[in-house]
């Protein structure tokens, strides 16, 4: 179901909606480019978001990009736990709406 081979089909998106696809890819590249925040940290943030949205493609892409940017397994592990803490914290704080 979730084969990375599916990402090869993204080229069809560019053919069917070239202007929007070009704008999206330019935005994506600019957002993740080296800047005030180093690329490694941007990729770790992207990995946390991917874990939160539970997109298997995004997880794999940003895991590899984080490694390529110099992230260690220990850094990725801490990123996993930060993500888990925030997801759990959101459930707890949203639970306050249930209390009278």
Each model region followed by its residue ranges:
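Short cysteine clusters
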Residues: 55-58
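Acidic, glycine/proline-rich low-complexity segments that act as flexible tails and inter-domain linkers
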Residues: 1-43, 67-68, 94-100
């Amino acid at each position: 179901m979730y084969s990375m081979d599916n990402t090869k089909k993204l080229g069809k998106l560019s053919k069917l909606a070239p202007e929007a696809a070009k704008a999206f890819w330019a935005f994506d590249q600019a957002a993740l480019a080296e800047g005030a925040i180093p690329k490694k940290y941007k990729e770790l943030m992207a990995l946390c978001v991917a874990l939160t949205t539970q997109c298997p493609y995004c997880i794999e892409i940003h895991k590899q990009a984080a490694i390529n940017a110099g992230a260690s397994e220990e850094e990725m592990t801490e990123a996993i736990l930060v993500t888990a803490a925030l997801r759990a914290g959101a459930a707890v704080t949203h639970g306050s709406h249930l209390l009278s």
